[in-house]
């Protein structure tokens, strides 16, 4: 059976397949650069594992309190060394990225302190955490103030407004690296470093925290290499490599991470407790594989931009722009196209390929959200997935793919569903 015939057996027409092959012809140099970054990051992870003498005893399960969990402690050293920080908190007890960010914020902000976002509105789920949308136990309910500086129309930082917003009470500055459900650009490590340097110039003791979700291993450097006091993320995204079934991390200055550990467990207990319940092999192996898995996801994102930009759909970033996270936004212009796109991603999934995604009122979001995610780990966005809120400009956010070839199939299937519904025409 020829390669095309295999794709055809999965539902991709000759027309769509041939169109995809034409797009791929122009991406060889981009793909080679991605592979080079993955090779560098693979060596970086491996060096940290060597220096910390990871061995088979690190995979032993612990229960109960989890005292003296050598594997847990060594994993946190591997994360800290890889990301160039003094300390790390890497735990299955952190359930998701929003949870990790909540721990980091609530641990380092006290009543009367001020939180500043110099990059506009945060991700939807953080709105209730902060109290922008009223919620019980939000930071605002506990007396933390929040200020926000929007980006300039061209997506750059409004440095004059940021300088004016940083005051005596400004304790922590939160920088969201990825675009979230917005159509702004994601920020490069270089740009984040420039912003951090500016904020530190305005107030040297301010804490700069970066929401690093979707950004790990996309570039050779991380925000912690350019001055971030804390970086925060989820293990069911990039650093889990598709193997971690749960978990989150906080890496940064030792005193800040220590406070996070006290907030996650209890004052006086901190990092000393937290059984691993036999989950550590997936954490170690996932982190080891993460640079390669992220490379495949990046190739998929660039391919998606190439596919849809040629058909006239606005893509953020576009097919030629540099990449700073694994997310590809495509403005489809209608709810019908969003649903068709997601049905194609779902049809290409290894799990639940026979189901049809429908919008629903997802907890933490203020609009109905449609999600396609036939994943081995529920909600994993390093696995092939697509989602978006059903609201103008009807943008779909595509990410992931444990292998490049799976990402490729998913993108072709998304286009196939649009073509079959008469919502797109291959040119």
Residue spans for each PLM region:
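Conserved PLP-enzyme active-site core in the AAT-like
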Residues: 3-28, 35, 45-51, 55-58, ...
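Short glycine-rich or small-residue beta-strand-to-loop segments that form or flank ligand, phosphate
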Residues: 58, 62, 89-92, 326-331
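N-terminal small-domain helix-loop-helix segment of the aminotransferase-like
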Residues: 63-71, 75
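Short beta-strand/loop turn elements enriched in aromatics
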Residues: 75-83
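Conserved C-terminal alpha-helix-loop-beta "cap" of PLP-dependent enzymes
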Residues: 309-426
């Amino acid at each position: 059976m020829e390669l095309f015939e295999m794709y055809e057996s999965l539902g991709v027409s000759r027309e769509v397949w041939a169109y995809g092959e034409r797009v791929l012809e122009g991406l060889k140099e981009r793909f080679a650069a991605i592979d080079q970054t993955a090779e560098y990051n693979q060596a970086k992870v491996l060096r940290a594992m060597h220096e910390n003498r990871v061995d088979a005893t690190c995979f032993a399960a612990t229960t109960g309190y989890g005292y003296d969990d050598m594997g847990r402690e060594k994993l946190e050293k591997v994360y800290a060394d890889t990301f160039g920080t003094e300390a790390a908190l890497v735990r299955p007890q952190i359930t998701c990225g929003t949870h990790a960010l909540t721990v980091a914020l609530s641990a380092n902000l006290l009543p009367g302190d001020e939180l500043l976002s110099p990059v506009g509105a945060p991700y939807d789920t953080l709105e209730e955490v902060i109290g922008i949308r009223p919620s019980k136990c939000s930071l605002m309910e506990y007396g933390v103030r929040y200020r926000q500086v929007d980006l300039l129309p061209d997506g750059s930082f409004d440095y004059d407004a940021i300088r004016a917003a940083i005051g005596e009470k400004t304790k922590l500055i939160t920088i969201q690296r990825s675009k979230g459900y917005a159509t702004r650009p994601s920020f490069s490590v270089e740009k984040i470093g420039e912003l951090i340097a500016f904020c530190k110039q305005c107030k040297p003791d301010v804490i700069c925290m970066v929401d690093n979700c979707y950004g790990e291993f996309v570039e050779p450097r991380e925000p912690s290499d350019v001055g971030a006091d804390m970086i925060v993320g989820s293990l069911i995204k990039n650093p889990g490599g598709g193997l971690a079934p749960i978990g989150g991390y906080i890496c940064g200055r030792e005193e800040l991470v220590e406070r996070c550990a006290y907030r996650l467990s209890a004052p006086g207990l901190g990092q000393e407790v937290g059984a691993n319940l036999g989950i550590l092999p997936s954490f170690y192996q996932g982190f080891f594989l993460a640079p390669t898995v992220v490379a495949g996801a990046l190739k998929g994102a660039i391919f998606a931009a190439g596919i849809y930009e040629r058909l006239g759909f606005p893509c953020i970033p576009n097919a030629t722009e540099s990449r700073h996270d694994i997310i590809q936004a495509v403005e489809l212009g209608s709810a019908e196209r969003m649903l068709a796109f997601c049905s194609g991603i779902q049809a290409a999934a290894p799990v639940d390929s026979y189901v049809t995604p429908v919008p629903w009122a997802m907890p933490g979001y203020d609009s109905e959200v449609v999600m396609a995610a036939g994943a081995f780990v529920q909600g994993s966005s390093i696995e092939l997935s697509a989602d978006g809120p059903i609201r103008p400009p009807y943008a779909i956010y595509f990410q992931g793919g444990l292998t490049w070839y799976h990402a490729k199939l998913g993108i072709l299937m998304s286009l196939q569903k649009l073509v079959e519904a008469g919502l797109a025409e291959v040119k």
